[in-house]
């Protein structure tokens, strides 16, 4: 007997405006291997492989346009790849999982502190104090991201054969 409601399979959303190409490549390979839906959202044109479950959405330019598009579409259980802390907070509120391109998970236990630190750093920059940017992406960052992605994929229910 079939269940009355078949839950929609979880999918992966990517805040692609600032997502490194090497991380996108990891995501493309995972989507090809697993058949998981992958959607990249950016305010510029994106090149994606020709796979039936990979798509790109181009949103109008403007602050937070890609973030808003993801937040409006994300569902509980989905995975969102983003460096944007406010977007990660919105994703967590929706019941989805958020992870940064370095493999760092955003959690309900850490998001408030991360928002606080972000606000403090913005104040410093507003006062003219140089705060620097993130360091270059290293092999260990790519490995940490791939490990987080694999954990999320392994936790997803597989359709019966």
Curated annotation (Swiss-Prot):
NCBIfam families on file: PRK00124.1 (NF001095)
UniProt similarity note: Belongs to the UPF0178 family.
Protein name as catalogued: UPF0178 protein XOO2722
Domain of life: Bacteria
Disulfide bonds: none
């Amino acid at each position: 007997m079939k269940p009355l409601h078949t839950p929609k399979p979880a999918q992966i959303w990517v805040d692609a405006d600032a997502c490194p190409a090497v991380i996108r490549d990891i995501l493309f390979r995972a989507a090809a291997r697993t058949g998981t839906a992958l959607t990249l959202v950016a305010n510029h044109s994106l090149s994606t492989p020709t796979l039936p479950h990979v798509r790109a959405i181009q949103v109008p330019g403007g602050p937070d346009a890609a973030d808003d598009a993801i937040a409006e579409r994300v569902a509980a259980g989905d995975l969102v790849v983003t460096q944007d802390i406010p977007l990660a907070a919105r994703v967590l509120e929706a019941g989805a999982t958020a992870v940064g391109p370095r493999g760092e998970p955003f959690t309900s236990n850490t998001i408030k502190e991360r928002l606080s630190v972000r606000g403090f750093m913005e104040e410093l920059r507003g006062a003219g104090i140089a705060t620097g940017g993130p360091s270059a992406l290293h092999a260990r960052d790519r490995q940490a991201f791939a490990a987080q992605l694999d954990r999320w994929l392994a936790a997803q229910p597989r359709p019966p054969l």
